[in-house]
Structure formats: structure tokens, C-alpha cells
């Protein structure tokens, strides 16, 4: 099971993500980002590639795809906040774009 990020680990793990467009979600210990694609099909293809990793790591995003824009929220429900798995999946999502 994952552990909630400590204050000491937040900066090193989340700082690079914030520099790449991720942001904290108001009122939650979660991060969010919207990915834009040329069309719905490209967005779905990206979501399928991400889904393979999410399933492999047993860590699933909250997300929606509307007209080629995929809104993503990452948090770890088991720890009621952010964990290293959220940072790992966020990095993977960025790399698959």
C-alpha cells in the first residue's frame, strides 16, 4: 500500500510536475492537468496507452474526455491524498503525450 506524501517528499516529487502544467486541486490533496489533443480519437488513444500503465500499477485516474480535451485528477484514495504513485502516473502521462 502507498503512503501519503510527507512535506519533505512533496517538493522533489511535485515540483517538476508543477513546472510541466500540473496544479493542486482546490480543497483536495490532489493534482490536476488538462491534456489537449487534435480530436477525440487521438485523446482516446492516449487514454488507452495510459490505462495500460494505470492497470499495471493498480492506480487509476479520475478523468474525462470531451472533444479531445482530457481532464485528469490524480489522488490516492487509500491514503486520502497524494502518494508517490500519483507522481509516477503523472510523469507517465506526460511522457505518453
From Swiss-Prot:
Belongs to the pterin-4-alpha-carbinolamine dehydratase family. It is an enzyme of class 4 (lyase). GO terms for biological process: tetrahydrobiopterin biosynthetic process. Keywords: Lyase. NCBIfam families: PRK00823.1-3. One of its GO terms (molecular function) is 4-alpha-hydroxytetrahydrobiopterin dehydratase activity. The keyword Lyase applies. It catalyses: (4aS,6R)-4a-hydroxy-L-erythro-5,6,7,8-tetrahydrobiopterin = (6R)-L-erythro-6,7-dihydrobiopterin + H2O. InterPro entries: PCD_sf, Pterin_deHydtase. This is Putative pterin-4-alpha-carbinolamine dehydratase. Its EC number is 4.2.1.96. It comes from Ruegeria pomeroyi (strain ATCC 700808 / DSM 15171 / DSS-3) (Silicibacter pomeroyi). It holds the Pfam family Pterin_4a.
